[in-house]
Design a protein with these regions (language model features):
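Structural motif
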Residues: 14-16, 197-201, 245
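Secreted, luminal/periplasmic, and some membrane-associated catalytic domains
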Residues: 6-10, 27, 41-47, 53, ...
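Short glycine-enriched, charge-decorated loop/helix-capping segments at active-site entrances
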Residues: 214-219
Length: 282
């Protein structure tokens, strides 16, 4: 959106369209392309965090620090005390360093942030947060659900939007439904709370880029789908005079040679292999 001379845009929304690269701008993404090439839009290249993984990239964006500084060196890590691997942990306290919204609060005490499905979103200092969080029963049963802050937000938003389509967020059935629900949750929060900063995670494109590869013709369908979801959000926020920023965590490219570290480690005799249900585990 183009603001007049001297006119300020006091609020912003950041749409994290995972996997989006400059090469995707074009006929399959007309609305994202229009934003990037509009007077209000300024297209910039970002050197991705290393390693190029969701948790590391997001923590880098939100702290302005490198993984070696904020401590999120991957989507998981090996705990040498417990001798266990820990993946996709949720506590925001794992991210070392001041978060973007905390920095902004030093200048504006009433600054409010909504963090929607960006990771490390439990026990966060963000004012409004929603994140995937299954419920685990005493009988071992697992129920798909979300966690929110404030806690009562979870009941209200599920009442209005329905259950979060968890199977379309992770796993073999991952698809556009989860990004659509997240986009609707961003509208819901904006209409009721008008945060100064909204962080919105839209993962759909990344699914098919990893599932099929970046040059597969089916990527065109994924591009059109996420362009529609993101485009509707762009229109919605611009109509409310909220500045729209679109970014990506990393890009997916073709590889010429595959390396399998665990196979090489096993060949060298560096791994202890355990049989579980007929499968090899470390």
């Amino acid at each position: 959106m183009n603001y007049g001379e001297g006119e300020q845009c006091p609020r912003a929304v950041v749409l994290n369209v995972v996997g989006l690269c400059r090469r995707h701008l074009g006929p399959d993404t007309p609305r994202l392309t229009s934003l990037a090439r509009s007077k209000a839009g300024r297209e910039r290249l970002i050197r991705p965090a290393f390693p190029a993984l969701t948790c590391s990239a997001q923590a880098t964006y939100l702290t302005g620090k490198t993984p070696s500084e904020h401590g999120i060196v991957g989507n998981g890590w090996y705990d040498r005390t417990l001798n266990e691997h820990h993946f996709w942990k949720q506590s925001n306290q794992l991210v070392q360093g001041e978060k973007l919204w905390e920095s902004l609060r030093r200048d504006r005490k009433d600054f409010r942030c909504a963090k929607l499905f960006w990771w490390y979103n439990m026990y966060s200092s963000a004012d409004y947060s929603i994140t995937p969080r299954p419920l685990y029963g005493s009988d071992g049963n697992k129920v798909f659900d979300v966690h929110s802050q404030p806690l009562e937000l979870r009941h209200k938003i599920k009442r209005d939007l329905g259950e979060f389509p968890f199977p379309s967020f992770w796993g073999p059935t991952a698809g556009i439904d989860s990004s659509q629900w997240i986009a609707e949750s961003a509208r819901w929060i904006e209409e009721r709370h008008q945060p100064d900063l909204s962080l919105v995670y839209l993962p759909h494109l990344d699914y098919d880029l990893q599932r099929f590869g970046p040059n597969d013709p089916r990527i065109k369908t994924a591009l059109r789908a996420i362009d529609e979801v993101a485009g509707d959000l762009i229109d919605f926020f611009e109509e409310r005079r909220v500045r729209v920023i679109v970014l990506s965590e990393y890009g997916i490219t073709e590889v010429r040679r595959t390396i399998h570290p665990n196979r090489e480690f096993r060949h060298q005799g560096w791994l202890n292999i355990k049989d579980e249900f007929g499968l090899d585990t470390l």
